[in-house]
Amino acid sequence: MREAFHKYRDIEIRAPRGTALNARSWLCEAPLRLLMNNLDPEVAENPKELVVYGGIGRAARNWECFDRIVECLKNLEEDETLLIQSGKPVGVFRTQRDAPRVLIANSNLVPHWATWEHFHELDARGLAMFGQMTAGSWIYIGSQGIVQGTFETFVEAGRQHYGGDLRGRWLLSAGLGGMGGAQPLAATLAGASALLVECQQSRIDFRLKTGYLDEQARDLDDALARIARYRGEGRAVSVGLCANAADILPELVRRGVRPDLVTDQTSAHDPLNGYLPRGWSWAEYRERAAREPAATVAAAKRSMAGHVRAMLAFHERGVPVFDYGNNIRQMARDEGVENAFDFPGFVPAYIRPLFCRGIGPFRWVALSGEAEDIYRTDARVKELIPDDPHLHRWLGMARERIRFQGLPARICWVGLGQRARLGLAFNEMVRRGELKAPVVIGRDHLDSGSVASPNRETEAMRDGSDAVSDWPLLNALLNTASGATWVSLHHGGGVGMGYSQHAGVAIVCDGTDEAAARIARVLHNDPASGVMRHADAGYPEAIACARERGLKLPMLGDA
């Protein structure tokens, strides 16, 4: 008989700080603290229900599983590995000291059954959990985790479309959840104003509180007046509007309003839990989702179709429009919008050249809980990468503008060679006592070689290999063999069930020689696998990078 399980608990979780261990080593303490940090009220979207971000992206399957995971991590030996199956601890096995302390598999389904309908059946029976990307892999750091990637996207869009200057320009988008909440700050850092539509007032309040959003408008007329004023003044200010994007975008099209950039980060990947149908209140949406899920999904997807038609109308008028990876184009196509993919996704439009060089989201977390540890590592990054003014500008803006959520953390986009250099330097700082406690290095699953997602990261690959998911599997296996502290393999993150597979990695810098050896392997091999993947697809930039870095790619030959 299956035991009872609970997804709600009226409790606040915060990660321990300082140097006192709750587990038997820092390699076990780190995943313990990062799991708990994912559920910090400053970090998670709905922590009392274990939801970190992305609709129903959870850190653990239920509270009973959370309790047992914590117990396992506290008692895990230095040569044991904990196995997590969709948020549930299922085994502890003797491995070796250089093996991962935790191996995680979340939301993975045999392809024929990889649908939201089947997943929700399993979820209701307590047999599955949606891990999103960094929710179930315990390395979410709040909206900062996506800010720089969003910033890089907006900057590149400005370079391509507006000569590199977004002053006096404005972005139209929607969604202020765990991912979309980065948009207003990223836009203003890039020099543009932004109008962000969000249907939940609580999310607007949270972004205002954390400084990611500057202000809120009373209604659409007020929002447009504010944007017009800030554009005229050459100021970059973000404005939130509590409304439904499925209503607002068609109305803007009707009025002939012309934004300078248009995208979307609503939770369109999950129509049952993340996208409000037109004319519904949020309370009605949640009630009807529980009572009549099929009708709710249908209503949400109809609204998405109207949303995408409005985006297409902007595109047809010459406005740069791009999909930001929530699969809204696919949902619209399912509803009969045959030209939904006329505007591109953000990766082929703006990011892929970075992936070809193994450049992606590199993040680290100070287990001490001390902000000063992050500031010291910021300075070390600048010393080790002295000739990248764009990176230095980012680090300066991040320190000035980004408020830490939970444990202090930092993200910056760096590539092959740079990641290992930084990781080894951080480990040496721990060894010398320059940092109060060890740091954890991780990344988003959205990275160069760790994801297969034909409507997002691997859209429009040069060789047509968009849907080949061997690559994230190889990435996870390679990071496991290389000695990462924990490794995760997920399905459905970002774009929903059936549309992606992706892998995550984290490694602890505890100041030991053993850690240095693991760091050198993992932080070289992880981005190198991304260069390999893109070189195999025929990208000249990746082939050149592979040769420059001396990667052994047997089939590369003289291509």
Swiss-Prot record:
UniProt entry tagged with the keyword Cytoplasm: yes
Record-linked InterPro entries: Urocanase, Urocanase-like, Urocanase_C, Urocanase_central_sf, Urocanase_CS, Urocanase_N, Urocanase_Rossmann-like, Urocanase_sf
EC number: 4.2.1.49
Top-rank taxon: Bacteria
Active-site annotation: C412
GO annotations of cellular component type: cytoplasm
Residues the record lists as binding NAD(+): 54-55, 132, 178-180, 198, 203, 244-245, 265-269, 275-276, 324, 494
Reaction equation(s) it catalyzes: 4-imidazolone-5-propanoate = trans-urocanate + H2O
The keyword Ribosomal protein appears for this protein: no
Keywords: Cytoplasm, Histidine metabolism, Lyase, NAD
HAMAP family xrefs: HutU
Protein name: Urocanate hydratase
Species: Azotobacter vinelandii (strain DJ / ATCC BAA-1303)
Gene encoding the protein: hutU
